[in-house]
Swiss-Prot record:
Positions where lipid (S-geranylgeranyl cysteine) attaches: 226, 228
InterPro entries xrefs: P-loop_NTPase (IPR027417), Rab33A/B (IPR041822), Small_GTP-bd (IPR005225), Small_GTPase (IPR001806)
SMART domains: RAB, RAN, RAS, RHO
Regulation of this protein's activity per its record: Regulated by guanine nucleotide exchange factors (GEFs) which promote the exchange of bound GDP for free GTP. Regulated by GTPase activating proteins (GAPs) such as SGSM2 which increase the GTP hydrolysis activity. Inhibited by GDP dissociation inhibitors (GDIs).
Top-level lineage group: Eukaryota
Quaternary structure note: Interacts (GTP- and GDP-bound forms) with ATG16L1; the complex consists of a tetramer where two RAB33B molecules bind independently one molecule of the ATG16L1 homodimer; the interaction promotes ATG12-ATG5-ATG16L1 complex recruitment to phagophores. Interacts with ATG16L2; however interaction is approximately hundred times lower than for ATG16L1. Interacts with RIC1 (via C-terminus domain); the interaction is direct with a preference for RAB33B-GTP. Interacts with RGP1.
Membrane topology: Lipid-anchor
Source organism per UniProt: Gallus gallus
Localisation: Golgi apparatus membrane; Golgi apparatus, cis-Golgi network; Preautophagosomal structure membrane
Motif Switch 1, residue range(s) on this chain: 54-66
Binding-site residues for Mg(2+), renumbered to this chain: 45, 63, 86
Alphabetized UniProt keyword annotations: Autophagy, Golgi apparatus, GTP-binding, Hydrolase, Lipoprotein, Magnesium, Membrane, Metal-binding, Methylation, Nucleotide-binding, Prenylation, Protein transport, Transport
SUPFAM superfamilies: P-loop containing nucleoside triphosphate hydrolases (SSF52540)
Entry protein name: Ras-related protein Rab-33B
Amino acid sequence: MAAELESSLELSFTGSGTVPGGGLPPARSRIFKIIVIGDSNVGKTCLTYRFCAGRFPQRTEATIGVDFRERAVTIDGERIKIQLWDTAGQERFRKSMVQHYYRNVHAVVFVYDMTNLASFHSLPSWIEECKQHLLTNDIPRILVGNKCDLRNAIQVPTDLAQKFADTHSMPLFETSAKNPNDNDHVEAIFMTLAHKLKSHKPLMLSQPPDRDQIHIKPEPKPAMTCWC
C-alpha cells in the first residue's frame, strides 16, 4: 500500500485487466479506510455491523486484534468502498497491531459509551494515540456517543460531550447501534465522512488492502452479547 494518505483505487477485475467479450472494463471504486476507536464495550463493533449489514448483531465475540467490515456506496454517481476498521480496546491486544491499524487512515470515528463516564474520559488518550501515529487534525474526525437508548443510565450529558467535540473541532453524534429507530442516524455518521472524503481526497492508483493481513480471526470463544 502507498504511504500517502490518499484514497486507493480498486479494480473489480483481475489478471491482465481484459474483459471477456471485449467489452468495456467494469467501474473502478475508490476505497477509504475509516478507523473506529474507543474503549472496550462502547459498541464499536456493533456500530460498524449496523452500518455494513443494516442490522444489530444479536451475538458477537469480543474483538481481538483488528477486524474490518466494508460497504460500497454510491455518492453523486461514483461508487465508493468504505472500509471500517475496528480494533480491540484492551492494550494487551493492541500492541502488536497498532502500527498496521493506523497505516493509510483517511478518517477517524471516536466512540464512547454514554452510560459510562470513564469511556468518555478516555477520549483524550485515544486522540493522543492518533497524534503519535501522525494523524493530523486535517483528517476528518467524528465523535460518537453510543447507547443513547439507555436514557435512565446516561452518565455523559450532551452539553459536556458537545463542549469536548467543539474543543477538538469534531461534529458530535449521539446514537444507538441497537435501537432500529436510530438506523438512519448510524447511516448518517459514516455517510457524513464518506461525503467529506469524496470531496477532498484525490484519486490515486494503489493496490487494495490484503484481507489476509488485516482480518484477524479470534480464537474460538463462547459467544457474548454485544453491549451497545
